[in-house]
Every structure is written in C-alpha cells, then in structure tokens.
Design a protein with these regions (language model features):
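Short S/T/G/P-rich N-terminal loop/turn motif that feeds into the first structured element of a domain
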Residues: 1-72, 76-101
C-alpha cells in the first residue's frame, strides 16, 4: 500500500530563487532516496508543505535517514524551519487525467 509523508515549513521569505533551487536540487534528492513522487505546495505567504509519495511503508522507512539529512540541508540553505512532519498509508485516492489535444 502506498505511503505518504507531509512536512510543514515556515520561512522568513520565499523567493522565486528559493523555489527554483528547491526544484532543481532538493526534489531530485528526495526522488533519489526512493520516493515515487513529491510536490511542494505553497500554503501561505511564508509557509509551504512538502508532500512525498512512496510505493509502500517499507520504502518510506528506508528513506527516512536520508530524508532527515535533506531536511537539515534545507534548513541550512534557506531561512526555513520545519514545523511538523506526518506520514501514513494511503487509504484511498483518485486522479483525474486530462487528455491534451
């Protein structure tokens, strides 16, 4: 069963440069430790969350030591603080796939 983690972050600033760096540097690092998907979601002017999908709980557990290192690096590189992190097995989901003309 798929597993998802969500980490909540606050910052003193969120610039386009920070977002670009996160997309180019940190998302590939997260994907490289076994994630099957990751999204950064801006939840406020100075807050965001990172939603990471894994194929299963075992993959998520295996990745956690490296994820902790990545989170530490984010906090060093940016004026950001992780407020909380949660995770659990996916109990239901749906996706809408749009057909491009």
């Amino acid at each position: 069963m798929a597993f998802v983690t969500v980490s909540h972050w606050t910052s003193t600033e969120i610039s386009e440069e920070m977002i670009s760096t996160a997309n180019e540097k940190f998302i590939p690092l997260i994907m490289g430790v076994g994630a099957s998907g990751v999204q950064m979601v801006r939840t406020g002017e100075l807050s965001l969350c990172v939603v990471t999908q894994y194929p299963d709980a075992a993959a998520a557990q295996t990745a956690q030591a490296k994820i902790a290192e990545i989170r530490e690096q984010v906090a060093q590189d940016f004026p950001m603080t992780m407020v909380s992190a949660h995770g659990g097995e996916v109990t239901g989901s749906s996706e809408l796939h749009q057909i491009k003309n």
